Design a protein with these regions (language model features):
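Carbohydrate transferase catalytic cores enriched for Leloir-type hexosyltransferases
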Residues: 1-371
Length: 371
């Protein structure tokens, strides 16, 4: 039996982003059905029950927490240092940090390690972060590079950034393994379910969808302004955590901002949209693009980072500062537009490379290569 320890903080706390990556990867590994692989998920606390419950029940999977009722400071210390003692006690053979960081002391305890690095936006674009946060993230990144036996980059863009900003010496330890998407996004959503979700969120009849944190880097204003140039019955629905950035969006009754939407409702919201817009200025990958394509939506994204890797050659890409380009691309993506259905079909073929069984197999092979 091989025991893999996994950093589960984001799995139990984050509804989207890093949390989705972790839950999807763990479930993909479970679906492989390898009876000789045991997963131990290490989290500083139990987090959100509805997120823990998304992990498929399996006898070879177990959540692990610090003992007692530690303070926030002790939880941080446990995750960054003393969790290593628990790994030794639990007989962990390899530890996987899912969010770009690793605890201190793994090498001293002879525990092999893998770290997934999603992006280096805090180094490429520090203007989007607080100064102290940037310093902390950079320290964690450089520590992970020193500590990790292997590094997973979730996109070619991220792989190149790691080499450029972390040094050529780490290049031979990097594996490019894309992230996958949850199976629920490729499953048909029943009409009754759509009706329930539409009523719950008071969704308009026709809308362009955006999913992601509403912050400056995500550039939602570009889509909001573009929608004003579309027919009057086309609305914008944006789903995600809101920041002060939303105050800069146009005041328009065709703009609907949804916060706190559970994962269980997302597929239905995707399925009722006419197009998906992802105008982010910089990403490590862009998993919402794949989710949208899996549901069957045409995608319009922006140039400048790595979104072409996620969306493939049959999505549309525009300048992140050009409202007219975004509006024209969205017009080409509405129901009835010429070539729309063919673009959707070819895009769905493209994202087959991101299916969970292939991703899990690559990650499992990486684990085995270190043991």
């Amino acid at each position: 039996m091989t025991t893999i320890g996994i950093d589960a903080k984001r799995i139990v706390r984050n509804g989207t982003g890093l949390g989705s990556y972790g839950r999807t990867l763990v479930n993909d590994l479970i679906r492989m059905g390898d009876s000789q692989l045991a997963l131990r998920l290490y989290a500083p606390d139990e987090g959100r029950e509805e997120l823990r419950e998304q992990i498929i029940g399996d006898g070879n999977v177990q959540f692990c927490y610090p003992t007692g009722h530690p303070s926030s400071l002790r939880k941080t210390w446990w995750r960054s240092r003393s969790v290593v003692d628990d790994l030794v006690e639990d007989g962990v053979d390899l530890y996987h940090g899912l969010s770009g960081e690793l605890p201190m002391g793994l090498r001293k305890k002879h525990i092999r390690s893998v770290v997934t690095i999603h992006d280096l936006i805090f180094m490429r674009h520090p203007e989007y972060y607080q100064w102290l946060d940037t310093r902390i993230y950079e320290w964690k990144f450089r520590h992970a590079l020193r500590e990790a036996d292997r590094i997973i980059a979730i996109s070619e863009r991220t792989r190149q950034d790691i080499i450029e900003l972390g040094g050529e010496a780490c290049a031979d330890r990097i594996s490019l393994i894309y992230q996958s998407f949850a199976p629920r996004f490729s499953a048909e959503v029943k009409a009754e379910r759509k009706a329930q979700v539409k009523e719950r969120y008071k969704l308009p009849q026709r809308y362009v969808l955006n999913v992601g944190t509403m912050e400056r880097r995500k550039n939602l204003a570009l889509v909001a302004e573009a929608v004003e140039l579309l027919p009057q019955d086309i609305h914008l629905v944006a789903v995600g955590r809101q920041t002060d950035y939303v105050k800069e969006l146009p005041h328009d009754d065709r703009i609907h901002l949804l916060n706190g939407v559970p994962d269980s409702d997302l597929a239905a919201i995707y399925s009722m949209a006419e197009a998906f817009a992802y105008p982010s200025r910089y990403e490590g990958f862009g998993i919402p693009i794949i989710e949208a394509i899996a549901v069957g939506l045409p995608v319009v994204a922006c140039t400048g980072s790595c979104l072409e890797e996620a969306g493939g050659p049959h999505s549309l890409y525009v300048d992140p500062d050009n409202v007219i380009e975004m509006a024209e691309a969205l017009k080409m993506s509405l129901r009835g537009a010429r070539g729309r259905d063919e673009r959707i079909r070819k895009s769905r073929e493209y994202i087959r490379r991101f299916e969970g069984n292939d991703v899990a197999r690559q990650v499992a092979q990486l684990y085995q290569s270190l043991l």
